[in-house]
């Protein structure tokens, strides 16, 4: 029997980290064995993540999955110098541990997923040193609207830091992308835009790999019998529509369309509109309880804020999943970004 091919998956974010970037490797790596690949995940030590950890999410990772962790520079040391990005803080540790693994063991491919983006630069460096082909995986564009039309300034406008980040991405992305043997992305538009920005990139293969879904998450949720009835009341005869996720400035026009439709429904059938409740969770993408509301102010513009509730702080993953399970309907909103 042919031995499985081996892939080193580099993902700075991984459970118990609770950020959105943790799910790409979490969902992908456990299923690679079904397709003839034996994965090893290289990630960051939980002590070096910022924000709250999600131990329940960590419990959902299959025990058979090999996970190697390395230290990153502590944020308390680097932030006074303006560096908080996990990819930068962990770059040295990821390089050191990846080099150690590639020296001692055989790997047939390297899979680096971004965000954060800077670890993508490990691809060309490790390929040059060890001759291992690498795949660059995009969860989001490296060079997108951040620093161009949106940023960390007031009202979500671009500021100096977001513009600097975009400038760095425009200079660094070609170095990584041109060396990539394969390019994958959550959408075809994402990798096509990246290749369009870098005409000299000639990957041997490209593929669209949506974030996807794992039935095991629902089975895990049911086994734990988690309930969030205080967040989504049941048996009250109301129509509970839930949105769980970040609400970016580029998504506000979509939300305005939703609120305008709810306002119009109130004009046409006030009794039906009175039964509708829109619930928003995690809109700020921050863990802190003091994060500012983003959905309620928009609802107020259309006079439907009495039908809207919002919890800006992020929920733990399985809490958010239970909230979606408890909902009458789930609201999925995109943004104005073409990818």
PLM feature spans:
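Acidic donor-binding loop of glycosyltransferase active sites
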Residues: 181, 307-310, 321-339
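Nucleotide-activated donor-binding/catalytic signature segment of Leloir-type glycosyltransferases, i.e.
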Residues: 275-284, 290-314
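Donor nucleotide-sugar binding/catalytic pocket of nucleotide-sugar-dependent glycosyltransferases
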Residues: 43, 143, 163-235
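A conserved catalytic-core segment of Leloir-type glycosyltransferases
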Residues: 2-3, 40-105
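Acceptor-binding helix/loop patch of EC 2.4 sugar-transfer enzymes
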Residues: 12, 72-84, 101-105, 129-170
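An aromatic- and histidine-rich active-site surface loop
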Residues: 83-94, 109-130, 136-146
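Conserved donor-binding/catalytic core segment of Leloir-type glycosyltransferases
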Residues: 230-252, 259
